[in-house]
Amino acid sequence: MTVSRRRFIQWTAAITALAPRGLRAAEPRGYRAELLPSQKEVWDQQVWMARLGPKYTGNPAHATFVDFLASSMQALGLEVQRDRYTFDRWEASGQPTIASKGRRFDVSSYFPYSGSTGAEGTTGELVYAGSNPRFDLSGVRGKVALVDFTINTRDWAHQYQAWGIHPPTETFPSASRPARGAINDLTPFQTAGAVAVIIRWLDVSPMNAADQYTPFSRPPQNIPGVYVGRDVGARLRALAGTGVRVTVVLEAETTADAPTETIVATLPGASDDDIVMLNTHTDGPNATEENGALGLVALAKYFSKIPRAERRRSLVFPMTTGHFAGPWVPSIRGFIQKNPDLIKKTVAAVTVEHLGCREWLDEVATGGAIGYRDTGRMEWSVAITPSKPMANLLVDAVQGSLDRAGVVNPVKGGFLGEGSSLSRAGIPTIGYIPQPNYLLAGPADGCIEKLSPELMHSQIEVFAKLVHRINGLTAAELRA
């Protein structure tokens, strides 16, 4: 979707008018910087977490991470509850391949929960079946279907109204085009009789497309699907329809009734009747998608050092599983369903996700080649809330930080992430959700080289200040 010039001018005028709020907000009452865990302590945990590899829902790396979170919270003196779920876990093994007559074609990644070919692969004539969303499936039976897509535009100028921007010299983008798969359902290809699907990225660089775990939280597709970059896809496109046969290999295992756990940690405050909730999810492919839980551990450590009598409200930390297995494991929705009494007591919620992100973008070079590079800036932190009181508190809390943040009101949808369900439950909620290109990428190093330890620590400090500011308001003021 193209954002019109008129809408862009309106958007720019609106955010420029709102940006100056709280240029130098006073420190919140009760904040004690010396109690915050050090940057080194937080980053050491981040490096350890990244070395676990992708923490897809319920896999061994994810289970190790969840155990670490539970034991860390217990060591800080918090009450810890573990809620167990089971589901049929699908996970790819080895590197997918495409081959034809001894020639190999590089595979960028696979479609999660798509299917499995076994080690021998599946072979069929290669045919081109169209570009998303217009496919011609009339001739795919018994064949390998090649399709392509362009990434979608998120029209932020339409979805959001800005409460405030930090730093105020920045202009919040009117739109975003992160690297996400646009084809969300392969079952029509399976129904039409195709034996495999090859999906080509058209407008994303090969480096950006590599290892993308997209789309996530989809039900089993029952047909193997793999991605290729635009250049490899162009070579395959030239072969499609010529009678050439290709073999696709995507090995995967399904573990029936695999266990996975949500962790709920509670730090009692002076009042048990009022709760501030700090939540995140624990499953994901890399160093940033699921690192919000490290932020919560740091915040729990900070607030546990403050005497209980000085903690106005109890803090509850739901760290949920199932963000990447939504059809089976309900993530924050399950927590809400299981804990109606806690939800009734919650006066505010802050969802913490995707910390420390630097901005990496594709850029078109001379000749049309697309390069992927670090822009030298921090990624935009999109902080979503329909609550004006909560927005004002965050706009003040972020002042002086390293964060590059847009605090926005989702007037036309776009409340992404784990905070949306809490907001729908009637809780004044901030969903803090930076959305870098590499958010769903699952390389061996977890994209940790794309993160900033300084930014991550600064963001955790912002959340600590935000909780203090929340506790400076009554429940009625927070709901105003």
Task: Describe each region flagged by the PLM.
Residues 1-3:
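Secretory targeting signals
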Residues 7-25:
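N-terminal export signals
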Residues 27-60, 76, 83-85, 209-218, ...:
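N-terminal capping segment at the start of a domain
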Residues 35-39, 46-164:
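Noncatalytic luminal/extracellular "stalk/propeptide" segments of secretory-pathway proteins
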Residues 44, 303-328:
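Short helix-loop-beta-strand segments that form the rim/entrance of peptidase-like active sites
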Residues 106-139, 213-290, 298-306:
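Soluble metallo-hydrolase cores and metallopeptidase-like ectodomains found primarily
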Residues 141, 273, 320-429:
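Metal-dependent peptidase/peptidase-like ectodomains
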Residues 229, 437-480:
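His/Asp/Glu-rich mid-to-C-terminal helical/loop segments that flank catalytic regions of hydrolases
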